[in-house]
């Protein structure tokens, strides 16, 4: 079965593309296209994994964001207040003049945790984010 290849155009900051190209060279990719295909496959697998998160969970959302982006700090606070029933704690600190690192510790229903993570992960200005989750452990 022949797979049809589609040609796309993507606009990226030069610094991001340079870093991507260097990573591809270090990892031995034969082309930028193959690296992009691999990155898209990984992104899709992560999304599919997130859709399987169900039931009682303990989780963290860790993110690095550009706090100089207009409105991002207040938007993050607003989103977190919408999910206050899930959030048990958070830690926030400044890693550079314009960048903050935050870890949000959560406990609750998996679907709601994913919903919160999706809202945060998609914000413009979030440079890196990671959802980590595990089934809630009950000790009796």
Curated annotation (Swiss-Prot):
<dbReference type="InterPro" id="IPR050192">
    <property type="entry name" value="CopG/NikR_regulator"/>
</dbReference>
<dbReference type="InterPro" id="IPR014864">
    <property type="entry name" value="TF_NikR_Ni-bd_C"/>
</dbReference>
<dbReference type="InterPro" id="IPR045865">
    <property type="entry name" value="ACT-like_dom_sf"/>
</dbReference>
<protein>
    <recommendedName>
        <fullName>Putative nickel-responsive regulator 2</fullName>
    </recommendedName>
</protein>
<dbReference type="InterPro" id="IPR002145">
    <property type="entry name" value="CopG"/>
</dbReference>
<feature type="binding site">
    <location>
        <position position="92"/>
    </location>
    <ligand>
        <name>Ni(2+)</name>
    </ligand>
</feature>
<dbReference type="InterPro" id="IPR027271">
    <property type="entry name" value="Acetolactate_synth/TF_NikR_C"/>
</dbReference>
<keyword id="KW-0238">DNA-binding</keyword>
<dbReference type="GO" id="GO:0003700">
    <property type="term" value="F:DNA-binding transcription factor activity"/>
</dbReference>
<feature type="binding site">
    <location>
        <position position="94"/>
    </location>
    <ligand>
        <name>Ni(2+)</name>
    </ligand>
</feature>
<keyword id="KW-0805">Transcription regulation</keyword>
<dbReference type="GO" id="GO:0003677">
    <property type="term" value="F:DNA binding"/>
</dbReference>
<dbReference type="Pfam" id="PF01402">
    <property type="entry name" value="RHH_1"/>
</dbReference>
<dbReference type="InterPro" id="IPR010985">
    <property type="entry name" value="Ribbon_hlx_hlx"/>
</dbReference>
<keyword id="KW-0479">Metal-binding</keyword>
<feature type="binding site">
    <location>
        <position position="81"/>
    </location>
    <ligand>
        <name>Ni(2+)</name>
    </ligand>
</feature>
<dbReference type="InterPro" id="IPR013321">
    <property type="entry name" value="Arc_rbn_hlx_hlx"/>
</dbReference>
<dbReference type="GO" id="GO:0010045">
    <property type="term" value="P:response to nickel cation"/>
</dbReference>
<feature type="binding site">
    <location>
        <position position="100"/>
    </location>
    <ligand>
        <name>Ni(2+)</name>
    </ligand>
</feature>
<comment type="function">
    <text>Transcriptional regulator.</text>
</comment>
<dbReference type="Pfam" id="PF08753">
    <property type="entry name" value="NikR_C"/>
</dbReference>
<keyword id="KW-0533">Nickel</keyword>
<dbReference type="GO" id="GO:0006355">
    <property type="term" value="P:regulation of DNA-templated transcription"/>
</dbReference>
<keyword id="KW-0804">Transcription</keyword>
<dbReference type="GO" id="GO:0016151">
    <property type="term" value="F:nickel cation binding"/>
</dbReference>
<comment type="similarity">
    <text>Belongs to the transcriptional regulatory CopG/NikR family.</text>
</comment>
<dbReference type="InterPro" id="IPR022988">
    <property type="entry name" value="Ni_resp_reg_NikR"/>
</dbReference>
